[in-house]
């Protein structure tokens, strides 16, 4: 029975709760989930390189032996570039995956041209760089669409207004940009995955990166695979 630690690298417990409520009914019964939220004084949301770096340090310090006891793999639920994934891979043998990588790996397996729905234009720019670092050709990326609002601003919008905005952006990715698979850029966006699926139709897969990461990591754990300790991830 693989045990996956799902890390919310910001300090907003409502996001952790939302992830837990969404994930638990979806994962197989033989997969156990644990959750960790960034300790205070971590940022409430991550919308910048600085916030990603500072929260990574706080979360890393919280990964004590007691927290990691019995854990088989770690998912980092941040849809922005964060040093936390590489920090964990370098310091532990446990498989670790960020939700950007998980969603893109899944998308490349079921579609030809990826669309990503994200929060701000800054996130859009950072994601293009991150995809380049994964070796994903720009020809496989239909577009990255931003809402023009931070994660915190999105969370504070009336639910119907937020849903309308996100659905509209997803439809643009599919109908205007030619995306044949869409990744939801953040744990907060996954709450309306079903509504987006209805809006774009059944032929276009909608990928929740957190769910994708848990499923991929459970598979790695079942294969008894660990992070390579030869090369870049040699122990410090």
UniProtKB/Swiss-Prot annotation:
Main location (coarse class): cytoplasm
Highest rank taxon of the organism: Eukaryota
Matches recorded under InterPro entries: Asp/Glu/hydantoin_racemase (IPR015942), Hydantoin_racemase-like (IPR052186), Iso_Racemase_Enz_sf (IPR053714)
Protein keywords: Cytoplasm
Transmembrane spans: none
Location of this chain's protein in the cell: Cytoplasm
A GO term for molecular function: amino-acid racemase activity
GO annotation, cellular component aspect: cytoplasm
Alphabetized PANTHER family for the sequence: HYDANTOIN RACEMASE FAMILY PROTEIN, PROTEIN DCG1
Family designation: Belongs to the HyuE racemase family.
Protein's name according to its UniProt entry: Uncharacterized protein C576.02
Organism annotation: Schizosaccharomyces pombe (strain 972 / ATCC 24843) (Fission yeast)
Upper lineage: Eukaryota, Fungi, Dikarya, Ascomycota, Taphrinomycotina
């Amino acid at each position: 029975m693989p045990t996956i630690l799902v890390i919310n690298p910001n300090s907003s417990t409502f996001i952790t709760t939302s992830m837990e409520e969404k994930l638990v009914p979806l994962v197989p019964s033989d997969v156990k989930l644990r959750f960790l939220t960034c300790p205070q004084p971590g940022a409430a949301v991550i919308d910048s390189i600085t916030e990603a770096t500072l929260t990574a340090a706080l979360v890393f310090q919280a990964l004590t032996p007691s927290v990691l006891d019995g854990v088989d793999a770690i998912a980092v639920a941040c849809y922005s570039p964060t040093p936390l994934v590489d920090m964990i891979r370098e310091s532990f043998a446990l498989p670790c995956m960020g939700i950007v990588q998980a969603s893109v790996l899944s998308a490349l397996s079921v579609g030809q041209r990826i669309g990503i729905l994200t929060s701000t234009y800054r996130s859009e720019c950072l994601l293009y760089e991150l995809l380049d670092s994964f070796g994903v050709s720009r020809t496989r990326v239909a577009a990255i669409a931003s809402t023009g609002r931070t994660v915190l601003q999105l969370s504070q919008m009336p639910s119907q207004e937020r849903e309308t905005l996100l659905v509209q952006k997803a439809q643009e990715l599919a109908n205007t940009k030619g995306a044949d698979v869409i990744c939801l850029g953040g744990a907060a966006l996954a709450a309306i995955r079903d509504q987006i699926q209805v809006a774009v139709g059944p032929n276009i897969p909608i990928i929740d990166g957190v769910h994708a990461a848990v499923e991929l990591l459970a598979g790695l754990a079942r294969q008894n695979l660990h992070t390579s300790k030869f090369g870049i991830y040699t122990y410090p």
